[in-house]
Amino acid sequence: MTSIHETAYPRFKPDLTQRELDEIYTPNETEQRFARRLGRSNASRLYLMILLKTVQRLGYFPMVADVPPSIVSFVTKALGLKLVPLCALVEEEKSRSRRDFIDAIRAHLKIHPITKDTDKAIELAATQAAQTKQELADIINVIIEELIRQRYELPAFSRLNRTAFRIRNQVNELYYHTLTDPLPAAVTSQFDAMLTLSAGQLVTGWQQIKQDPKKPTNTEVRQYLERVKWLKSWACELPQVDHIPVVKRGQYVYEARALDAADLKAMQQNKRYALMVLLFHAQLSKALDLSLIHI
């Protein structure tokens, strides 16, 4: 899971400048008429206006306790009202007024409430984003952008976070299967053997694969070419990886490089073999590029 602060999920700034208050939270004449028409008292008109101006900024309706006092004070003055006690706003929130005001504001701003259609839009946006993105924050940002574009009210961040996490895992599993399903048993057995330190070995086969090739000296050229040949022979036994988007593929390879043999052995089998396939191809590509430059 990721933190809300790593994403574009709208939230209140801790400190607002006077200019920001003026530009974001000043109600226009149409909005003031809207509040006067629906509000029965100063407290109800103020509460309605706070909901209206904050949902315009956030895309969702906050509770009054979460609204910075500077915004409440500014909107109060903008409406030409005297100080309204916070307890009066809380009473409005507890009453039916909150639901009635939210329904009226949604209609006024043409915002769709959170329904099953919202869930469908979230799932679709997450699925499309996860095809090329691996970071949860990036997937969540795509979801937010799409919900705003379609004028949906934003659900709680935790809901977006859970959905993005679940969809990303589903997409990853599909990609992993495209790499592991074609693997013959002989290859997976050799993969497993690479994760165990055999007698006489100083490092595992996996660690040897992870070692990045360096510019070979004249005396090392033969050894280097043998490594390239060995990697090529492996590549012939492995499925291609070009169907996976470059960015996504790069993130998988980055993860594979960070894992040692013990990490891989503890991993779910499907993902383990997929990461090994991807690293084999990445190391071969790097070795071939280096050979063109230095040999």
Regions found by a protein language model. Give the residues of each.
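Long amphipathic alpha-helical coiled-coil/heptad-repeat bundle
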Residues: 2-293
